[in-house]
């Protein structure tokens, strides 16, 4: 039963992971980026009357600050990557989505945990075009990185998925 074999685990350190040791074919994580910021979500409430603009309440979403800075962040991430390596099957692969704040450090840790020889690719996820005007006077941060590793060297799984680009996308990414 294919549905019984597929599972999506969301959250941090879900219970019962030991039963999955060596059975997970694909892991994708999007951990915090060590941005040293607190994040809030906005909740729009309708105004009392038609003339009044909606009221906005900000609610705390999560904190991406670490007691000892980047060192604390890396100490949090390392054992989780070790656990994920143990969960991967022989043909398992892991994708770690990260940005410029911490990417270089995470790559070194992943090389240590999964082995440099198991690094397959650095996928660039273009996130925005950014302000390229002369007033900006700096390079724009316009992408995130997804590091891709196999558990074991030489084992490759590729499921070819092709979808024709729309004309709008063809024009936007014509280079």
Regions found by a protein language model. Name each.
Residues 1-175:
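Core catalytic lobe of class I
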